[in-house]
A protein has these predicted regions:
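Glycosyltransferase donor-sugar binding loop
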Residues: 22-28, 173, 199-215, 232
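Carbohydrate-associated surface elements
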Residues: 133, 153
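Nucleotide-activated donor-binding/catalytic signature segment of Leloir-type glycosyltransferases, i.e.
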Residues: 213-234
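Conserved acidic donor-binding segment of nucleotide-sugar-dependent glycosyltransferases
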Residues: 289-297, 304-310
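Aromatic "clamp/platform" in nucleotide-sugar-dependent glycosyltransferases that forms part
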Residues: 254
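Short hydrophobic beta-strand element within catalytic cores of glycosyltransferases
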Residues: 271-275
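Membrane-proximal helix-turn-helix segments that form the acceptor-binding/catalytic region
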Residues: 97, 109-127
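Conserved donor-binding/catalytic core segment of Leloir-type glycosyltransferases
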Residues: 128, 161-181, 187-190, 202
Length: 343
């Protein structure tokens, strides 16, 4: 999310906005980079109780406070500071109000909602969603305020394109949260494919609460060690090189906020298999991705479709969609126009 916030901010500056990013810092002096003012704000508390101190000073002269993520105490504190100086705030939950996430750790979320999150949502000036189909997620919480609709942007490095799949592997990039990301479904899908047709799959990303070990055990249980490799998170040029050489990209999430790695893969023309979450449906509706239900059987069929001749045509269509609709400058201009109309 940090990278996306930076790219959003840089694009908003190019669109004519003045942007200040307040971040956790001690006595450091602020700085300016890429047209963005970086303002360190002292925080207090530990763990989930950490919150900004005297944020009111940083809000002097601000037209709007943008709060990223959800279910976070620092947002509760920051919103209270904004209200105290009559600065409206906009919530950027980035998929965190998806019903699947609301149901996770349900009792804790319910208590948190009653204590803090309900007021945060109710008193928001507006809320940002990626796609219109997310509206029911926030209305289910009782939110009836303004919505700003704009996806994340994506701009691959110059000269980076799909090379036709020279690496010979299907790639997944993400956080090792097996239930959320559907990695158990993906592995069972691979196991369903006849050995002679079974693809080699590479899984790269950071661990999440022991999820990598869960995936390793399932690989062993299913006898998939010759076909599935687990790797570390990759960034920068190494990530783009891995993407460009993949024979296909797969994203089997049971639910998802946006899925930046999907956007990255599609943007350079990699044949991509998605499940029907908002970005996946958006791409598939425009002929830019192969879509499958989040079941092992459906994903197995989708993996086999990645190697079909039509997959390259779908990939090319997806790259055109990304260039036309989801450049950072285009989405920033849309976000800014919608937000300014609400102020």
């Amino acid at each position: 999310m940090t990278g996306a916030v930076r790219r959003w901010s840089e694009s908003l500056v190019r669109a004519g906005a003045s942007v200040v990013i307040a971040f956790e810092g001690g006595g450091d002096e602020g700085s300016t980079s890429g047209g963005i003012e970086w303002l360190p704000v002292r925080h207090t508390g530990r763990g989930w109780r950490k919150r900004p101190v005297q944020l009111e000073h940083a809000l002097h002269g601000a037209d709007l406070l943008v709060l990223h993520s959800a279910w976070a105490f620092h947002n509760i504190s920051a919103a209270a500071a904004a209200r105290s100086v009559s600065v409206p705030y906009l919530l950027e939950p980035r998929g965190a109000y998806d019903p699947h996430i609301v149901r996770r750790r349900k009792l804790l979320k319910r208590a948190w909602w009653i204590a803090w999150e309900r007021e945060l949502v109710a008193r928001a000036h507006a809320m940002h969603i990626f796609f219109e189909e997310e509206r029911p997620h926030v209305t289910a919480l009782g939110y009836r305020g303004a919505l700003v609709r704009a996806p994340n942007g994506i701009e691959p490095p110059n000269g980076v394109h799909w090379d036709g799949g020279s690496g010979g592997y299907v790639l997944w990039l993400g956080r090792f949260d097996p239930e959320h990301k559907g990695l158990d479904l993906l592995l069972r899908a691979v196991a369903h494919i006849p050995i002679a047709e079974r693809p080699h799959v590479r899984l790269h990303g950071p661990d999440f609460r022991g999820g990598k070990d869960v995936v390793r055990r399932l690989i062993g249980t299913l006898g998939l060690d010759p076909w599935v490799m687990i790797g570390d998170a990759v960034h920068g040029q190494a990530k783009w090189a891995l993407l460009s050489r993949a024979s296909g990209f797969v994203y089997p999430s049971r639910w998802e906020g946006f899925g930046n790695s999907v956007a990255e893969a599609v943007s350079i023309g990699v044949p991509t298999l998605v499940t029907p979450y908002p970005l996946g449906r958006h791409l598939a509706s425009r002929g830019g991705a192969i879509i499958a239900e989040p079941t092992a059987d459906a994903l197995a069929a989708g993996l086999q479709a990645l190697s079909a001749q039509r997959a390259a045509e779908v990939a090319a269509a997806g790259a055109r969609v990304m260039r036309a609709e989801m450049s950072w400058d285009a989405v920033a201009r849309s976000w800014l126009a919608q937000t300014e109309a609400l102020l």
